[in-house]
Curated annotation (Swiss-Prot):
Described purpose of this protein according to its UniProt entry: Probably involved in the control of the structural glucose backbone of osmoregulated periplasmic glucans (OPGs).
GO cellular component entries: outer membrane-bounded periplasmic space
Designated name of the protein: Glucans biosynthesis protein D
Entry annotated with the keyword DNA repair: no
Top-rank taxon, per record: Bacteria
One protein family per Pfam: MdoG
Gene from which this protein is expressed: mdoD
HAMAP family: MdoD_OpgD
Main location: periplasm
An example molecular function term from Gene Ontology annotations: catalytic activity
PROSITE patterns, per database record: TAT (PS51318)
Subcellular location as annotated: Periplasm
NCBIfam families the record matches: TAT_signal_seq
Amino acid sequence: MDRRRFIKGSMAMAAVCGTSGIASLFSQAAFAADSDIADGQTQRFDFSILQSMAHDLAQTAWHGAPRPLPDTLATMTPQAYNSIQYDAEKSLWHNVENRQLDAQFFHMGMGFRRRVRMFSVDPATHLAREIHFRPELFKYNDAGVDTKQLEGQSDLGFAGFRVFKAPELARRDVVSFLGASYFRAVDDTYQYGLSARGLAIDTYTDSKEEFPDFTAFWFDTVKPGATTFTVYALLDSASITGAYKFTIHCEKSQVIMDVENHLYARKDIKQLGIAPMTSMFSCGTNERRMCDTIHPQIHDSDRLSMWRGNGEWICRPLNNPQKLQFNAYTDNNPKGFGLLQLDRDFSHYQDIMGWYNKRPSLWVEPRNKWGKGTIGLMEIPTTGETLDNIVCFWQPEKAVKAGDEFAFQYRLYWSAQPPVHCPLARVMATRTGMGGFPEGWAPGEHYPEKWARRFAVDFVGGDLKAAAPKGIEPVITLSSGEAKQIEILYIEPIDGYRIQFDWYPTSDSTDPVDMRMYLRCQGDAISETWLYQYFPPAPDKRQYVDDRVMS
């Protein structure tokens, strides 16, 4: 497994993997698509043509690593790269009357070495023209780029694209596709956070992880006044090709993406990840090990939320473990899942650089039957916030063999809150700390005599108020150890209930402890299910060290 080290930020997700052989696969046509910056020959294009291209490409050998960049681009620093600006006067839809959306392209350079081809499509005639790279599309400012090295490099291509929405045209983008098959979007805060990918391959296997590339995009010319646009993408890698259609709705408070893909396997694939997403979790209310900074919490997402095919809602708080962890949650035709950032309180982060309280959640809603499979969650140890250490995706149960073809349809919601909510009580927060004493009576003279770990899980909403007089019962299941000192506490400031228990080990094992809990009233579940993974310390660390100096 290749533990990717992508640098966080819109300019810092380096692309890896193969080039595309699409040049020989285009059909010929005689008419032009309408775009002032498109300068290539006309060719007919629609989604069925793209599917045929991806299918035919899968029958050919993958072309391997990208070709070298001109020296002036290959040696760029991140600061120099970020100073390059696309000329807004030459944006893709600059001349569309009453345009509400516009698109610009990212320059090649630094870690972005894979050429991405761009095409403008007239949706009325289905005719496309390529947009070739030329230096006059960009403003180089203080980047120190030797533009003479770029003259005549019309096949250099671009690194990706981003889309702007009125009234912030050319100022604040709302959608970005940059690096391999990574893409992101924002909600009404305009703050980027976690990323999605076109596909994940061998994320957690004994093989090196493979990162497919989007190697070409086709943009339907946006309609006047429209806030929805359609872009098509060709995906290519050593093991698979794919045709993608993104219908992207840039709404006032969220971005919604309707995604349809058709995939064609070149090789057998051990682990195929559908609708993958990548996030960061360094520390939070439940995981304090790496919180030795001025910030109480540091994370893009605080939980994995799952709405299972059987209707069960699950909340799985994220971790920053000391050792890489991968968990797979079995399901059949899942209703939805996502990495959520539900804590939106600035005081819980105190971060005026990262603005983690403004980062969007990402929810996946399958639009066709996905069948049996698992939702995979990988958590990688990190010492800070510059590593995306959380990966989540859907893995079909059926093994992928060379020559297989399959299609998935799903909707992505980039928003502060997911589009659907558990009607039962929901987990608001998870906290852990020292146990072994009555709540409110942490001894000041000495530590508790017996070591234990306390867990406090806050539930809000649902029918908790109605259930309280009848009796609320926490149902706790542990893979090892035992739960004691179980308490149910009403928390007035949140108008919810805290379930608190102490975990005591029953062996010397340091294997992760899988915890499961939900609330029940008169035999009926009244909350979503809380899942947690705790990593007990070694036996010789299960003691409290009194380091006070009393004299």
